[in-house]
Amino acid sequence: MVAYLPLGITCGSSFANLNRMEALYRTMTSLCARREYCCADIAEKLRKKGASQEQTAVLIDRLIEEGYIDEGRYARAFVHDKILYNGWGRVKVAQHLRAKGVCPAYIQEAMPCITEEQYAEAFQKVLRSKQRSIKGDTDYEVRQKLARSLIARGFEPSYVFDNMNLDYVEE
């Protein structure tokens, strides 16, 4: 198929491919301008839009070069939001970042962006919320259920047992 351009210039499928790339680029910059994305998220969105692996690689490189994608910035935002707003622990956050293919160095760098006070506050919020809904016959049973629930939310087992006070368990 031949496309006709103004001034009598003709061009083959490479012109259509160029327009497609530019349209995909504009779509991805619009998405990245609204919130943080990692490379894996953008690659998945491009795959769903029908982009080839080569096009995906070129577009992701361009987005990184122009500052639309920054894995370190993404990791910091992810850690902040998941701990403070979703009540996740460090273990679960790190696991999800690894699953998205974020570099371990960025994960390590992002973890300290949450202070110990903020982390303790998030832990206590989840603890209070869960203790209202967990039922058991004995204090021991309630504490075990509570501990399992907190560990499943991604809080470190040692942190859970060190910071879970009997004062929070009501009969």
Q: Which ranges hold each PLM region?
A:
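An alpha-helical, amphipathic repeat domain used for nucleic-acid recognition
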Residues: 3-171
